[in-house]
Structure formats: C-alpha cells, structure tokens
Amino acid sequence: MLPRSAGRDTTGLLFAREVAIPAMSVAAIVGSADIRIPIGLPGHRALIWLSLLVAVALVTRRRDTVIAVGAACTAATVMLHAGPSPSVRYLAAAAMLYAVAGAPAVQRRPWLVVIAAAPIHLVAMADPVAAVIRGGHLAGILSVGMGEKLQWHLVFGLAAGLLGWGLARGIGRLPRFGEVGKE
C-alpha cells in the first residue's frame, strides 16, 4: 500500500510483514471468535479482529493480502462454527479495506485508513439487522437501542483503526500519524 525504499527491508522483516503478520492475524482472529467478554458494549470485539485487519492492510506490500486474511478467517470460523453469518464480516471488512487502501489519497496519507475503519466496522451490524428482518420486525431496525449499537460500532471501529495503526507503526512500517507518505 505504501511506497517502499529499496534498501530498508531486510529479508527477515520482509518475511514478517508478508507472511508472519498475516498468519498470526488469522490465528488471533479465529482464536478470538469464540471469546465472549460480557462488558455490555456492542462492537468491542472489533478491537481484536478489525485492528488486525487494519494492521495487515497497512504493513503488507500487496493490498490483496488483507483479502486473503479475511477469507482465511471467514473460512476457518465457518468450519469451526455452525453458520456463516457472523463469519462473513471478516471477508467483507477485508474487501472494504482493500478498496480503501487502493485509493490514491490513502496511498499518500495512510492514516485515512484509521478513519475508514469506523464505517467499515458497520459490517458487524449486518447479522443483527438481518435477524430483525428475518423475524418480521422491520420496525425493530429503528427500535430503541439500535442507534446506540450503531454508535458503539462506529466508536469501536475508530478505536480499532487507531489500534491497527499503532500495530503497523510498531512494526516500523508507517510514517508518523499525519505525515504524508512519499511517492
């Protein structure tokens, strides 16, 4: 996603960015899929899965790596769990990150991915909204509490974007927040 200088990447760091980070992200996302932390705030689990997808989108040389990670997470969680509904969020979010990362403005200013993570996290709302519609309660979408869920998903999406940025920055891949990437 970002321009690279020819001499900065060593073989070990390149391997870590292109193979180890995506593989560890898949393992962490799939491993955390069953963890339920009852803190009562909808969308808090994005701090794990979306932040890792954001980090993968920012650190790898090939943008399509994030789609591979999302697809692997979706496939693994579908195999481990009963249905595909909640698992599709990983692939959907990865596809959106892929699209956002390809925008010329984002390639020059990669910190924009942080902001984009907030609305991208709304893919996690697809399953609850579909359940309300399947139940024949279309008015339930606008019910009390749905607006609050949307707001929390946006908040945790932004927080996941910031956390993903921090992870990518910790790997040493990104300019400081607000700096413009070189072309």
Where are these regions (language model features)?
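Cytoplasmic membrane-interface segments at the C-terminal ends of transmembrane helices
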Residues: 2-15, 55-61, 98-112, 162-183
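Hydrophobic transmembrane alpha-helices
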Residues: 2-59, 64
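Juxtamembrane/transmembrane-helix boundary motifs in multi-pass membrane proteins
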Residues: 9, 13-17, 41, 61, ...
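Hydrophobic alpha-helical transmembrane segments
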Residues: 19-24, 51, 63-71, 87-92, ...
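Hydrophobic residues within the alpha-helical transmembrane core of Major Facilitator Superfamily
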Residues: 27, 75-76, 96, 118, ...
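Interfacial aromatic-anchored transmembrane helix boundaries in multi-pass membrane proteins
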Residues: 32-43, 73-102, 132-135
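Juxtamembrane membrane-interface segments at transmembrane alpha-helix termini
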Residues: 55-64, 79-86, 100-109, 125-131
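Membrane-embedded alpha-helical hairpins and interfacial helices in multi-pass inner-membrane proteins
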Residues: 107-183
